[in-house]
Amino acid sequence: MTTQLLEDITHRGLVSQVSDLAQLEQLLATSQVVYCGFDPTAGSLHIGHLVPLLMLKRFNDAGHKAVALIGGATGLIGDPSFKATERSLNSKETVQGWVADLSSQVESVMNPHLSEPIQLKNNADWFSGIEVLDFFRDVGKHFSINNMINRESVKQRLQRPDQGLSFTEFSYTLLQSYDFAKLNSELGCSVQIGGNDQWGNIVSGIDLTRRLNKQTVYGLTLPLITKSDGTKFGKTEGGAIWLDPKKTSPYRFYQFWLNCDDADVYNFLRFYTFLSVKEIEAIEANDITSQQKPQAQGILAEQLTRFVHGEQGLASAQRITQLLFNGQVQTLTLAELEQLEQDGLAVHAISDAKINIAELLVKSELASSKRTARELINANAIKINGEAITDEHAQLDFPLFDRFWVMQRGKKQFRLIKLA
């Protein structure tokens, strides 16, 4: 089973570095404890965190125990690895709130898919009880400044004439290294996974665990997910795609994956789903030979929306998508309209419903001028709440739930008009 796991994640392109592949294969022949750390830098995780979360499930499916470490202490410092500038320090109260949010989120997203609940740890629980002199004596003595400043993740920052590296950030690797040693002694944790920017910290943790606990532990890093053009994947012009439905609605989340480029989608199926590599290859082959629209994006969007938001969130996202593009928006529920208001459609607020529709088309930027607006209306290219507008002098009427109108130009351009 373990050999199959390592072969599978390697075949998927999910392995960047491994501390000792041969020894790790032997170790994973029996059930192990595997952890990944997440520092609280916001009140929600985003899709950049999905690959390590999904990797924890892959290990769990292979018979291992999954641990998520929420960095209540390290989040107060900020990891400088490959960062161009120093992070802004957040207050303890803010970080504590984020720790609670992330802990709840990890459980709600992961537990429905695991054979046993994920175990959560907060490194503030042990760092808050350590005296600074004890930490320097017992942990700091095992770290060489020479090695630390020669690490590539630090060297890039030191070479920037406009940016230094504070002692606060420089000490981060000691904290993360101690996490590994602590989880090893407390839970028997033997494997740490993380992004490839964490390699230096993971290796330091392996070394510290050997020195403090006389135990051999292992690390595995995942590659930075990039698009086919080489750019970093995961953010849009509107910002991050969050896992919290209050920050990114299930509809917006679903649409993000549905709009993946053809050049990227098959790799993303390998990275983000549990479909076998053979199944993904079959989907790709069918899309290439079929004269129909590719199926891969729909499969990716369905798999991930179900994983993060459950069957109800997926059903809602699919229903909104279907109703919008079938022109049946009058049957949208209030909750679905509120998803569209949150981030699904561009919103134009009005204070009075007695407004000429041609004028509204211009104000909402669906038409460049009143003349264009009239031409669109006369060409039957404008719909409001699914009904075609044929009178250029018409005014708004019959709002959905007393305050919403969905205005549509052609097949793909929408505005949500809201009575403020």
From Swiss-Prot:
Its main location: cytoplasm. Its EC number is 6.1.1.1. CDD domains: S4, TyrRS_core. SUPFAM superfamilies: Alpha-L RNA-binding motif, Nucleotidylyl transferase. ATP binds at K235. GO terms for molecular function: ATP binding; RNA binding; tyrosine-tRNA ligase activity. It is found in: Cytoplasm. GO terms for biological process: tyrosyl-tRNA aminoacylation. A motif ('KMSKS' region) lies at residues 232-236. It is an enzyme of class 6 (ligase). A motif ('HIGH' region) lies at residues 40-49. Keywords: Aminoacyl-tRNA synthetase, ATP-binding, Cytoplasm, Ligase, Nucleotide-binding, Protein biosynthesis, RNA-binding. GO terms for cellular component: cytosol. Residues 355-419 form the S4 RNA-binding domain. L-tyrosine binds at Y35, Y172, Q176. Gene3D superfamilies: HUPs (3.40.50.620), RNA-binding S4 domain (3.10.290.10), Tyrosyl-Transfer RNA Synthetase (1.10.240.10). Pfam families: SYY_C-terminal (PF22421), tRNA-synt_1b (PF00579). It catalyses: tRNA(Tyr) + L-tyrosine + ATP = L-tyrosyl-tRNA(Tyr) + AMP + diphosphate + H(+). Coiled coil: none annotated. NCBIfam families: tyrS. Homodimer. Catalyzes the attachment of tyrosine to tRNA(Tyr) in a two-step reaction: tyrosine is first activated by ATP to form Tyr-AMP and then transferred to the acceptor end of tRNA(Tyr). Belongs to the class-I aminoacyl-tRNA synthetase family. TyrS type 1 subfamily. PANTHER family: TYROSINE--TRNA LIGASE, MITOCHONDRIAL (PTHR11766:SF0), TYROSYL-TRNA SYNTHETASE (PTHR11766). This is Tyrosine--tRNA ligase 1.
